[in-house]
């Protein structure tokens, strides 16, 4: 019989995790005790024997990363944070799922003192982010590692459940991970065969192992994840020994292990009943009359294990000091990027345009920006969801990020071929954004950012600097028709907190959009870009556009303010002459490329742009939702588009000088008898 390195103290520690999961959810009268009870052995082995980390410095560079994709099991992560010595107390556990606590109902990134790399909640988002973290490591290692200096050698460990595997985003991300041969990625499948509805057999009976083998993953099996600690450790070690594939560990567990309801969906998403709490504590040798019990020897044991895990940081510091002497340029570059600073004068590389310059589509103007910035910002890592020739996201001289064995590129490459995987791309970029030395951007059609909305929302919630290059932004894309023409898309994202939604009207505004996106340290940005050519406008400057809105054409005697974005700004300018010749009306024109940035300006400035005294009317070939905060009347789209040449579509939907002028005339007439027209910018709150 083989002797085990695990003893009674390990069993006690695991059962402490389980009883804390019971008490934390019971105290909150809310939460998911089942998965934490089932995964307690795997978490114990991972953090006590496998991972390198340091609770005293949670963000040290070469730490192993842990992602809890089945985020409803977050009480497990909070308990481990407490036991391992992160800044999370028993009182914090007692505040689980309470307003303003360190322990919300799903993992969030707002507390840098914990080991939460990125938020997780909607199932599948965590594993997609884990793929991004793994790409981040592979790329950073290829760029910065040198013989004898493994600056980046960490693993990414991801716990995920049956629900994550059923979500489409996990398929997209894991398929790409297999293609990219991300051997530093280890996913642990909590194979307990239970979801909220009941047994997975009701809806999910595919062969997951064969599916992942088809993706190009290595498969490791652990038959008893409930008690076989040696088997669990062996599984991790075997996964770490694989050097050419990511690994899926098929860990068979019992949900709610120790509960009278173990192995059933009843223990998934509700606290245990009081009598069951007593049962669990008696079963594991704890006093059933007490709560939140942690034996002193368990604290002592984890302190000892943490000392071993954190020793890697001290060795790393010594290595980095030598690296800095040997490779000063690379170390200076890395330190600059990690400090979230840009090279001096980088903004001078932004293209600047003057009126009369050639009319160019803003997607092409975006490409010109990338051509200018990517050579001077090595932290920019781009890609596209198989629309590179349309999105124009690959800068001149770019090299692809590919496994070296593919002969298609190297891990040092900075352009990722995401394939037709919009949601996967966005989820992966969330991981890239938090790895460290990377600012990710990814391209697709604006309409298909809707496919990625779940991951975009997580970027906003996580305060991640991610850039979505969203081309073909309206009916102006033409013949592909309404399946590809966004109508309601931007209204959705404009309604989302903490995301900047840019729709530039010309070259200077496009440069401004990129400047804003890059310098918005904790906010993602969407850049909506045209397929059709747009003129370079008279009063457009980068400085003006960086205010989010500004006066493009002033007239102190104006009867109306026309407010446009993107391709409709030039239409508004052209309409001014039509209004004067046909209706004897004078108009001023405002460009409003980014509502969110405009909102950050003082009210006095916003009132100078959209003043009192005359009505304001918006012109935008999208749904009009949200415009009432800036204008009195909104001209937009109220149906889907159509298939045909872009000019014909603009005619059909009346986005012409005559169509805009007619509506402007009606707006002026509607407000002419109102003695004082108040700007919509003036709001009570």
UniProtKB/Swiss-Prot annotation:
One GO location term (cellular component): nucleus
Reactions catalysed, as given in the entry: D-sedoheptulose 7-phosphate + D-glyceraldehyde 3-phosphate = aldehydo-D-ribose 5-phosphate + D-xylulose 5-phosphate
Residues where thiamine diphosphate binds: 72, 121-123, 163, 192, 268, 422, 448
Annotated binding of substrate, by residue: 32, 268, 363, 390, 472, 480, 531
Principal EC category: transferase
Site feature location: Important for catalytic activity: 32, 268
Required co-factors: Mg(2+); Ca(2+); Mn(2+); Co(2+)
Any one GO molecular function term: metal ion binding
Cross-referenced CDD domains: TPP_PYR_DXS_TK_like, TPP_TK
Domain of life where this protein originates: Eukaryota
Annotated InterPro entries: THDP-binding, Transketo_C/PFOR_II, Transketolase-like_C_2, Transketolase-like_Pyr-bd, Transketolase_bac-like, Transketolase_BS, Transketolase_CS, Transketolase_fam
Residues of the active site: 422
Family indicated by similarity: Belongs to the transketolase family.
Quaternary state and interactors: Homodimer.
Protein name listed in UniProt: Probable transketolase
